[in-house]
């Protein structure tokens, strides 16, 4: 999965025609509701969160978001689960049990619960100049943070339909003062620290990054067919917009 959401003992509406044994159990306070579970309960929660994210972009940012932007925003705000079954495969993000983690809206879009959370984005589905047309092409963006809070970055794109990844983009981050670098999904197992060749979502998460200016580079490592648009989301204690600084 890309994300997970609560799916155990969820209170749901009960059909008057369905026998009680089709559900997990009765809801004592109201006979029109029952307890249910599984992906049938988790999926509506994710859909509701996606609707809130879309509403945020339309109403607060005056932007019609692409599917990739909704996906990047939701994944960017996830919370990593540490229970044994959540990390049974491996304790790195992403894994086969929880993807990039559990949806957590307080970390997803600006809200009163997280007053220091700022969000900047690039959504290139209507910007031809920021769409990849060949392998080896790259775009660079710059932003600044004040420090003292976490930093999260998520890149997502809608790939061509196929059994495996077709257009491979890669995410790189650099702190301009120190020169320290990070790559997308660098916490995958085996410790290879190489660009991810398999996923159409890449994240960088820093718990206590130094203040200053940062450079993001997105590269088309392998582009079978273009143009390829993408969505980029950055959240944290941002002190500047996410500005385009290089197109090549």
Label each PLM-derived region with a short phrase:
Residues 8-9, 79-82, 158, 178-179, ...:
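Acidic glycine-/aspartate-rich tracts in secreted/extracellular proteins
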Residues 6, 70, 149, 167-169, ...:
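Residues that flank catalytic or metal-binding motifs in active/ligand-binding sites
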Residues 91-167, 224-226, 231-248:
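Secreted peptidase-domain scaffold signal
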Residues 28, 34, 90-96, 170-233:
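Noncatalytic accessory or regulatory domains flanking protease catalytic cores in secreted, cell-surface
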Residues 3, 39-42, 46, 63, ...:
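Active-site-proximal structural scaffolding
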Residues 1, 8, 151, 169, ...:
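Residue-level detector of short, conserved catalytic/binding motifs and their immediate flanks
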Residues 3-87:
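Hydrolase catalytic cores
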């Amino acid at each position: 999965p890309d994300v997970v959401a609560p799916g155990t003992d969820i209170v749901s509406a009960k059909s008057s025609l369905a026998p009680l044994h089709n559900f997990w159990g009765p809801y004592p306070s109201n006979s029109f509701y029952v307890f249910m579970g599984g992906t049938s309960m988790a999926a509506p929660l994710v859909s509701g969160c996606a609707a809130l994210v879309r509403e945020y972009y339309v109403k607060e940012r005056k932007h019609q978001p692409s599917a990739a932007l909704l996906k990047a925003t939701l994944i960017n705000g996830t919370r990593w689960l540490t229970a044994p079954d959540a990390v049974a495969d491996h304790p790195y993000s992403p894994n086969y049990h929880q993807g990039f983690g559990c949806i957590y809206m307080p970390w997803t879009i600006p809200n009163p619960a997280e007053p220091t959370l700022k969000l900047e984005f690039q959504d290139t589905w209507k910007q031809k100049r920021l769409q990849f047309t060949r392998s080896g092409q790259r775009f660079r963006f710059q932003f600044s943070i004040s420090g003292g809070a976490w930093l999260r970055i998520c890149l997502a794109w809608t790939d061509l339909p196929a059994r495996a990844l077709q257009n491979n983009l890669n995410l790189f981050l650099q702190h301009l003062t120190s020169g320290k670098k990070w790559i997308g999904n660098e916490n995958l197992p085996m410790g290879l620290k190489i660009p991810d060749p398999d996923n159409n979502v890449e994240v960088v998460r820093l718990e206590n990054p130094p203040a200053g200016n940062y450079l993001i580079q997105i590269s088309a490592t392998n582009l079978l067919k273009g143009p390829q648009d993408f969505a980029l989301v950055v959240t944290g204690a941002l002190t500047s917009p996410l500005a385009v600084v290089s197109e090549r």
